């Protein structure tokens, strides 16, 4: 082996050893938090999984038995599950899309505001600081016929909360109003990392505001965008409060979380309710996995390229 080859091999081994040492350090730093998380969450998840494999109804406590995947079969062949899943996915897709567009616009405004920047940020974040149930009731009363200021704008005898599509539209509005500030806050953090010199150089080169946004700003804040979309998608998929207050899940407006609540706390069916919660957990895990695979290193937990 020549001296050049020896130096090359030494450099490769050095980089490999450095990477392994870096990963060992990362595992050591993460281990305490990971162990605490496992200790707190492993038992509830495991117990829910165990209950999902049993016929367990509190109304008939003496009729408990292990039935394997029977509860999952019952759920997956039932139209109520698929209706609730479709409603959940529709609310998630529409609300997160609108929140991203509005959140990006608000983030750009807050980032560029020169006077009263703190006041603008505080005003934008107020809706996010309101308890979801309180905000939901404010929307509920606003759309109640006869007393609601928004319902009074509609034709006489209109009751939007008694119809599926109008109800889902109101749920989306409530979601967007409440959580757009969260989206804008995450995107604002990403905008702070965009070099002003780069934007000025693009402007000098004749790039329009739209091209600076699409060719410079958005690519550079991609990690912040992915984090914001991932967190909001997972949160929106588990929607419960707004639907529970506004419609109670009636008229085919219930989400998968509402379906689980109805089976567990209204029907006292611990087995079916636990199975639904496990399915929700599985759906959330699949969504997170898809985000990581689609966006790679930009997604939380993604593997950096070349590593």
Curated annotation (Swiss-Prot):
It holds the Pfam family BPD_transp_1. Residues 85-291 form the ABC transmembrane type-1 domain. Gene3D superfamilies: MetI-like. It is a multi-pass membrane protein. GO terms for biological process: biological process involved in interaction with host; transmembrane transport. InterPro entries: MetI-like, MetI-like_sf, Sugar_ABC_transporter. It is found in: Cell inner membrane. Keywords: Cell inner membrane, Cell membrane, Membrane, Sugar transport, Transmembrane, Transmembrane helix, Transport. The chain crosses the membrane at residues 25-45, 89-109, 123-143, 168-188, 217-237, 272-292. GO terms for cellular component: plasma membrane. Belongs to the binding-protein-dependent transport system permease family. Part of the ABC transporter complex LpqY-SugA-SugB-SugC, which is highly specific for uptake of trehalose. Involved in the recycling of extracellular trehalose released from trehalose-containing molecules synthesized by M.tuberculosis. Trehalose uptake is essential for virulence. Probably responsible for the translocation of the substrate across the membrane. The complex is composed of two ATP-binding proteins (SugC), two transmembrane proteins (Suga and SugB) and a solute-binding protein (LpqY). PANTHER family: GLUCOSE IMPORT SYSTEM PERMEASE PROTEIN GLCT, TREHALOSE TRANSPORT SYSTEM PERMEASE PROTEIN SUGA. This is Trehalose transport system permease protein SugA. The gene is sugA.
